Amino acid sequence: MNYIDLKDKSEAELLAMLKEKKLELFTLNAKQKTMQLTNTSELRVAKKDIARIQTALTAARAK
């Protein structure tokens, strides 16, 4: 997911995506704690996606 893909989306779409990504991060953290997560780089990717979405939200609200 790139910032370019996100900057054209509406605020409602971004909020929905943010909620979905936070839920995904929660499940990944739970899997890591129970030693079920094999690819730990998914955590980093999810965190960066959340940061990108929050940046796009801030830019959308500033307009």
From Swiss-Prot:
Family annotation (Pfam families): Ribosomal_L29
SUPFAM superfamilies noted in UniProt: Ribosomal protein L29 (L29p)
GO biological process, one term: translation
Annotated Gene Ontology cellular component terms: ribonucleoprotein complex; ribosome
Cell inner membrane recorded as keyword: no
Keyword terms: Ribonucleoprotein, Ribosomal protein
GO molecular function, one term: structural constituent of ribosome
InterPro entries (alphabetical): Ribosomal_uL29, Ribosomal_uL29_CS, Ribosomal_uL29_sf
Entry similarity comment: Belongs to the universal ribosomal protein uL29 family.
NCBIfam families in the record: L29 (TIGR00012)
Protein's name in the database: Large ribosomal subunit protein uL29
Species per Swiss-Prot/TrEMBL record: Sulfurovum sp. (strain NBC37-1)
